[in-house]
Design a protein with these regions (language model features):
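Non-catalytic structural scaffold of enzyme domains
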Residues: 1-202
């Protein structure tokens, strides 16, 4: 019997992609038109951004914990959060959570190991790229992680918050991401971990 999944959402675009992906891929294992029961809860992105910008991860954790408590009440048996940035509050949440969570970086590490990847590049919000979220997890698997240089971090962050979270992805931005990815590839990195809301247009 598949478990009831609870999605702790942050940005609408990221949460929508997570939900669509679950429902699109589940039938491969579960049968036509079949997917697990899924519930979702989200506070406005602005609520999260107020605390993210001030570096108040305790308050970010409180929002996440409130969401997961609502999801547990709905019957969710475990939680996923498709937002990489707020995983900086992950440990503060899980110690009080009524249900278990999947950690997004642990899932990436598992996939990297299965494919034999040793050198990963990481692109995402500046809050994520300069955080411990991925390095701490990847190091346990002897996987290295590299982020873009400072000026590139700022441009990527701007594109995410001015375009991607609003469902917009301009051609110039798409080409810029492809350029950054190609630079990492030329330096010998196995793959770029695109920790951003919808990147499928790439």
């Amino acid at each position: 019997m598949p478990k009831h999944i609870g999605i702790v959402a942050c940005s609408a675009e990221g949460a929508a992609l997570c939900y669509r992906t679950l429902c699109a891929e589940a039938p491969v294992k579960m049968g036509t038109h079949t997917h697990p029961e899924v519930s979702m809860h989200t506070y406005p992105l602005s609520d999260y951004m107020t605390h993210i910008r001030s570096g108040n991860w305790t308050q970010v954790a409180e929002l996440m914990l409130s969401s997961v408590q609502k999801l547990a009440t709905m019957g969710a048996e475990f939680a996923v959060c498709p937002d990489n940035t707020i995983h900086q509050a992950f440990d503060l949440v899980t110690e009080k959570s009524p249900i278990p969570w999947l950690h997004i970086a642990e899932t990436v590490a598992q996939e990297a190991r299965s494919r034999g990847f040793q050198n990963l590049a990481l692109t995402g919000t500046k809050y994520l790229m300069t955080s411990f979220v991925y390095p701490n997890i990847l190091e346990k698997s002897n996987i290295s992680c590299r982020i873009p240089e400072g000026d590139k971090q700022e441009k990527i962050d701007t594109i995410i918050f001015e375009e991607l979270v609003n469902g917009v992805f301009l051609e110039g931005s798409r080409l810029y991401f492809n350029q950054v990815i190609q630079e990492f590839k030329d330096k010998g990195y196995d793959v770029d971990v695109l920790t951003l809301v919808p990147t499928y247009p790439l």
